[in-house]
Amino acid sequence: MKTGIHPDYAPVVFRDLASGATFLTRSTVSSQKTIEWEDGSTYPVIDVEISSESHPFYTGKQRILDSAGRVEKFNTRYKNFGK
């Protein structure tokens, strides 16, 4: 690999603004804001609007749209079509 062309891959904390959850992971993204982690070390923090802690798909609070009504409406409208 060439030296000097790859981004820095370092530990970063992602903070979910909706739920307040924090995740320590590694990333190439960086920030001027920092946070002190549970281990006493200071890491750059990236604020995200939504994560797996607050997204309805992952929390189980998703709404499932009822498409059966639309299918039934379509079938009743076109049941005699082509006969």
From Swiss-Prot:
GO biological process: translation
Pfam short name (any one): Ribosomal_L31
Stored InterPro entries: Ribosomal_bL28/bL31-like_sf (IPR034704), Ribosomal_bL31 (IPR002150), Ribosomal_bL31_B (IPR027493), Ribosomal_bL31_sf (IPR042105)
Cross-referenced PROSITE patterns: RIBOSOMAL_L31
A cellular component term, taken from the record's GO annotations: ribosome
Highest taxon above the source species: Bacteria
Quaternary context: Part of the 50S ribosomal subunit.
Family, per entry: Belongs to the bacterial ribosomal protein bL31 family. Type B subfamily.
Protein name: Large ribosomal subunit protein bL31B
